[in-house]
UniProtKB/Swiss-Prot annotation:
This is Large ribosomal subunit protein uL11. NCBIfam families: PRK01143.1 (NF002232). Forms part of the ribosomal stalk which helps the ribosome interact with GTP-bound translation factors. It comes from Nanoarchaeum equitans (strain Kin4-M). PANTHER family: 60S RIBOSOMAL PROTEIN L12, LARGE RIBOSOMAL SUBUNIT PROTEIN UL11M. Belongs to the universal ribosomal protein uL11 family.
Amino acid sequence: MGEIAIRLLVTGGKATPGPPIGPALSPFKINPGKVVAEINKLTKEYEGLPVPVEIIINPETKEYKIIVGLPPTSALLMKAAGVTRGPQRTVHEWVGNVSMKDVVEIAKKKIDSMPTSSLKAAVKSVLGTARATGIKVENKDPKEVTKEVDEGKWDHIINE
């Protein structure tokens, strides 16, 4: 029998042995408390954010490894803006503001999971998510900042 992968979305630094982790591990007779402690240690940096986690289990040896993904871009933006939820209306309602440096840092973290290898394209993707999440960048609509990125205005920050 090969390895089994269990994919979960947990709250960074706050996973518990209850559902969904405990029930997912019980057929393999693996101590959920030990797994949860390790998950919490690995996700501490993203405390309070939704974090994708994959637990790879060898059912014969009961050995496992934990692979931690990155929180969604929207969650990283909301954390950087210091807000806990997005806009309540579909029309653009601004709930927060981040700096261009925050956008570039998020793009650098997420670039490996994006269909691009260009940091500039990754920054533009993060700007699109910021707009959809109701977060301004440098106190401007992210759509306006995207135009400025195309014009090269932010190259000094993107290329740092």
